[in-house]
Amino acid sequence: MSTPHLYPVPEALAANAHINNEKYHTDYARSINEPDVFWAEKAREFLTWDKPWQSVRSFDFHKGEATWFEGGKLNVTVNCIDRHLPTKANDVAIIWEGDDPSVDASITYQQLHDAVCKFANVLKARGVAKGDRVCIYMPMIPEAAYAMLACARIGAVHSIVFGGFSPEALKDRIVDSDCKVLITADEGLRGGRAVALKANADKAVAHCPQVHSVIVVKRTGADVAWNTERDIWLHEAQQSVDTVCEPESMDSEDPLFILYTSGSTGKPKGVLHTTGGYLLQAAMTHKYVFDYQPGEVYWCTADVGWVTGHTYIVYGPLTNGATTLMFEGVPTYPTAARCWEVCDKHNVNIFYTAPTAIRALMGQGDEFVASTQRKSLRILGTVGEPINPEAWEWYYNVVGDRRCPIMDTWWQTETGGHMLTPLPGAIDLKPGSATLPFFGVEPVLLDGEGNIIEGEGEGSLAIKSSWPGQIRTVYGDHDRLIQTYFSTYPGYYFTGDGARRDADGYYWITGRVDDVLNVSGHRMGTAEVESALVLHPKVAEAAVVGYPHDVKGQGIYAYVTLMTGVEPDDGLRKELVAMCTQEIGPIAKPDLIQWAPGLPKTRSGKIMRRILRKVAANELDTLGDTSTLADPSVVDDLIENRMNR
């Protein structure tokens, strides 16, 4: 592969950053060698406690057990809201940007406090108490954050289901976590279209007799079906409640939320996060990874239905007293300039999005970026999947005008917060690399026998010891936690991802371990081949899978989406094969290339590779559930034009 270009830390940034290179290495060494001392200091620095802890941490990876700050007590909303009021009551906590560019709102910390307390009192009036589970099925409106924080205020456990999920998916999650209350809206708005949330909720709840209350936020004012025994309008319920709600003091290890993540097989896993450790991970990573400075406007484009929205729209920024932007819309509505127009409108300093969005916007051309100023931007970030170097360079050069470092963050729903990531003032950047571990994170690379790979090498990525934001259990099924994360390599947390470590100790995520190609006995990650394909200026996006090959065992099947206006032909096909040969070697030449107008993606933007593998293998009768796809019709096109008949 071509040698990556190194982007050194700008001197001016290093001089004013929270963490410079020397401090990173000193503090990282302390976090590994003296973890109890290091984490106790950080827990006192970042969080406000009602009662101190007895022990900082204990863990047993053979049993999948971990506790942090045991015996300590705190409330999440006191940390996110109340403690800021003496100095920040009139500062903006949340900027809300509606789907319609002419609609926005600013919510101060005082207004946030009052809204959360009123919402919490509505929940209490419906019988919700500490430890009860509450399901949230909402659009990206401020009330989604209020609902989360209202649960945390009274010690209830929230389970957010992304507003794009089907009634069936919603029902499964309500049943699994035994939620008695559901919070939703009449409709959502996304890209100029209405999303029938209440109608979907009604279909789901029809199969959930345990749900006694459905609290509905009026977003569009659309007519919706109404069950007078069960349904209540939030605005009506709030008329009779107070703006004071005493916070419930929670044990550090009390549950804060359950968030479902799809398993490779079987039903979704309810990832359970607890209070103290998770909040510390959220706050620390938000401040250090984005070098957040007081008064800055921070925008994470995720939905609160995903962990990125939990940690980096709500809990991390608010714990740090930041101004966090919530966006109801999509990056391409009404035009592909929307993100950059929002950055100009609200003077956004830090912008955090997914490689999928970056590639989509890159495919639309530079003119949409060039039509805006983006002068306020200081730090850029990516999350959700590895970013290929070409998209990284475009993001850096075109969006950031070559002056904004990119934080390529690797983490998971299960880790709670960033695990491998650059820090703006400390770590030189290599496009496509998540660089180095965050404080307290001990990554290891393991071979097929579970032996540690030292120095340069490639293997399965695992974590050697506990970190504060670690998953505590799979809700209601601790055996599944052990089976999924702690049994493959006993004594380690197994991430399910493969990684390569270079001569500088930088980590490169090579894709899910089940996305490893084995061609004639040679192993390579799908991400490597995809990166080679998208080097071509006519390629917008590519996804690579293996398929059964009579000679090689596995052949390489590439799905390629071209830039807008580009017509496919055999000449281009040959150029792409040559690109892979040039970048990786002859072994990486795709055997089959299918031109794909779109790829099957979940609503969070992740490519559903299971479907790509099935189509490539011609196993069309076992495609499985496609209900969580953003556009299920994409699959029909892939099947119709498949190459391996």
Curated annotation (Swiss-Prot):
Q: What is its EC number?
A: 6.2.1.1
EC main group: ligase
Q: Which GO terms describe its molecular function?
A: acetate-CoA ligase activity; AMP binding; ATP binding; metal ion binding
Q: How is it modified after translation?
A: Acetylated. Deacetylation by the SIR2-homolog deacetylase activates the enzyme.
What are the recorded Gene Ontology BP terms?
acetyl-CoA biosynthetic process from acetate
PROSITE patterns referenced in this protein's UniProt entry, alphabetically: AMP_BINDING (PS00455)
Q: Which UniProt keywords apply?
A: Acetylation, ATP-binding, Ligase, Magnesium, Metal-binding, Nucleotide-binding
* Binding positions for CoA per the UniProt entry: 190-193, 308, 520
Known catalysed reaction(s)? Answer: acetate + ATP + CoA = acetyl-CoA + AMP + diphosphate
Q: Name one GO cellular component term.
A: cytosol
- Tell me the superkingdom of the source: Bacteria
Q: Which residues carry this modification: N6-acetyllysine?
A: 606
Q: Which Gene3D superfamilies does this chain map to?
A: 3.30.300.30, N-terminal domain of ligase-like
Could you tell me what this protein does?
Answer: Catalyzes the conversion of acetate into acetyl-CoA (AcCoA), an essential intermediate at the junction of anabolic and catabolic pathways. AcsA undergoes a two-step reaction. In the first half reaction, AcsA combines acetate with ATP to form acetyl-adenylate (AcAMP) intermediate. In the second half reaction, it can then transfer the acetyl group from AcAMP to the sulfhydryl group of CoA, forming the product AcCoA.
The protein in question is named: Acetyl-coenzyme A synthetase
Q: Which organism is it from?
A: Saccharophagus degradans (strain 2-40 / ATCC 43961 / DSM 17024)
